[in-house]
């Protein structure tokens, strides 16, 4: 669920700098379609805004290739994981059409887009210092990625209307926590004004 009431939690305001920002589109895959569908248009709008502002875009794809990469997720979710090569592992078609090349895809097998991936090297190579986070699930992979980005020294912008999870309570709890200590909250309108109005 996405929410506009997140402005209640906003403690700091800032706009992303398109010269040093990247957009991270987290796990917009068939497995999560029921959660992703309500925010699909906002996700597409955010991608379009960032492309028009010349902001690089990266798309994560969560999947497991073998039992050796299940880690704690296998225990926690009783083996109900996204397996590589299945329809569930594929990026939602509308989002997949926005991918311009294989270098934009980040394969991951944990909640974090940074853990055991090449994401940080990709970002460092092109001088990225800020990340904008959208996708699913707000309170798991999006939040973990945002927190880890902050700890790694990236300025974090977290979308309130292009992230979603299983219910409003969990979505709002993440927004409250991130606004308090980790991320600037943004939405499509703010990004459009901040990135395209100049």
UniProtKB/Swiss-Prot annotation:
Catalytic activity: nicotinamide + H2O = nicotinate + NH4(+)
Keyword Nucleus in record: no
GO molecular function, a single term: nicotinamidase activity
Keyword Hydrolase: yes
Pfam families documented for this protein: Isochorismatase
UniProt signal peptide: none
Keywords assigned by UniProt, alphabetized: Hydrolase, Pyridine nucleotide biosynthesis
SUPFAM superfamilies for this protein: Isochorismatase-like hydrolases
Pathway as given in its UniProt record: Cofactor biosynthesis; nicotinate biosynthesis; nicotinate from nicotinamide: step 1/1
Source domain of life: Eukaryota
InterPro entries xref list: Isochorismatase-like_dom, Isochorismatase-like_hydrls, Isochorismatase-like_sf
Record note on disruption phenotype: Delayed seed germination, reduced seed germination potential and increased sensitivity to abscisic acid (ABA) during germination.
GO biological process, one term: NAD metabolic process
Group of enzyme by EC: hydrolase
EC number assigned by the record: 3.5.1.19
Function: Catalyzes the deamidation of nicotinamide, an early step in the NAD(+) salvage pathway. Prevents the accumulation of intracellular nicotinamide, a known inhibitor of poly(ADP-ribose) polymerases (PARP enzymes). May play a role in the regulation of seed germination potential.
Family in the record: Belongs to the isochorismatase family.
Protein name per Swiss-Prot or TrEMBL: Nicotinamidase 2
Originating species: Arabidopsis thaliana
Gene for this chain: NIC2
């Amino acid at each position: 669920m996405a929410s506009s009431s997140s402005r209640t939690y906003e403690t700091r305001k800032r706009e992303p700098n398109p010269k040093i920002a990247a957009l991270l589109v987290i796990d917009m895959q068939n497995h999560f379609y029921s959660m992703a569908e309500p925010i699909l248009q906002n996700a597409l709008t955010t991608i379009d805004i960032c492309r028009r502002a010349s902001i690089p875009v990266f798309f994560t794809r969560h999947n497991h290739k073998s039992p050796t990469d299940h880690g704690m997720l296998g225990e926690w979710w009783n083996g109900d994981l996204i397996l590589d090569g299945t329809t569930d592992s594929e990026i939602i078609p509308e989002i997949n059409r926005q991918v311009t090349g294989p270098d934009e895809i980040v394969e991951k097998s944990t909640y974090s887009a940074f853990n055991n991936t090449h994401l940080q090297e990709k970002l460092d190579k092109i001088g990225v210092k800020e990340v904008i986070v959208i996708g699913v699930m707000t309170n798991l992979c999006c939040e973990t990625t945002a927190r880890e980005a902050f700890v790694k020294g990236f300025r974090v912008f977290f979308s309130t209307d292009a992230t979603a999870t299983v219910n409003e309570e969990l979505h709002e709890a993440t927004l409250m926590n991130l606004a308090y200590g980790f991320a600037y909250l943004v939405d499509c309108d703010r990004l459009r004004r901040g990135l395209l109005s100049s």
